[in-house]
């Protein structure tokens, strides 16, 4: 392999993203599609770019991502987490900046399971006194 690449795994909700950073022009590819083609919402695109913009590495790396599971929000968060981990592998001095922004910490919030005898995780069926 001629060019050096950096790898990071990111997780959020039920999404798992595998991220490779290679020195390049700044193209972001998600599941063999461009970022604009893969994500429709502007907020999802912004979340994906956040760690690169914070560390001023926007045009320095080409980002290749394979992401599975979850929805748009979870996948975007997983990609951001993976990019952050890959950036740390590339340059450990970025740790302080990324930690302060809260990008290194894995967001452990997941959907609460539905309980039996209830309509949802916490919602009850409608109660009638009479």
UniProtKB/Swiss-Prot annotation:
GO terms for cellular component: cytosolic small ribosomal subunit. One of its GO terms (molecular function) is structural constituent of ribosome. Keywords: Ribonucleoprotein, Ribosomal protein. The lineage of its organism: Bacteria, Pseudomonadati, Thermodesulfobacteriota, Desulfuromonadia, Desulfuromonadales. It comes from Pelobacter propionicus (strain DSM 2379 / NBRC 103807 / OttBd1). Belongs to the universal ribosomal protein uS9 family. InterPro entries: Ribosomal_Su5_D2-typ_SF (IPR020568), Ribosomal_uS9 (IPR000754), Ribosomal_uS9_bac/plastid (IPR023035), Ribosomal_uS9_CS (IPR020574), Ribsml_uS5_D2-typ_fold_subgr (IPR014721). PROSITE patterns: RIBOSOMAL_S9. Gene3D superfamilies: 3.30.230.10. One of its GO terms (biological process) is translation. This is Small ribosomal subunit protein uS9. PANTHER family: RIBOSOMAL PROTEIN S9, SMALL RIBOSOMAL SUBUNIT PROTEIN US9M. It comes from the Bacteria.
């Amino acid at each position: 392999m001629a060019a050096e690449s950096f790898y990071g795994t990111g997780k959020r909700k039920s999404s798992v993203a595998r991220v490779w950073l290679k020195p390049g022009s700044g193209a972001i590819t998600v599941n063999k599609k461009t970022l604009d083609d893969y994500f429709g919402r502007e907020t999802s695109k912004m979340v994906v770019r956040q760690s690169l913009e914070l560390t001023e590495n926007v045009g320095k790396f080409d980002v290749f991502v394979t992401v599975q599971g979850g929805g748009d929000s979870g996948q975007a968060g997983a990609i951001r987490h993976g990019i952050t981990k890959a950036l740390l592998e590339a340059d450990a001095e970025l740790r302080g900046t990324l930690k302060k922004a809260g990008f290194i910490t894995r967001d452990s919030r997941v959907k609460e399971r539905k309980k039996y005898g209830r309509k949802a995780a916490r919602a009850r069926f409608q109660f009638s006194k009479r």
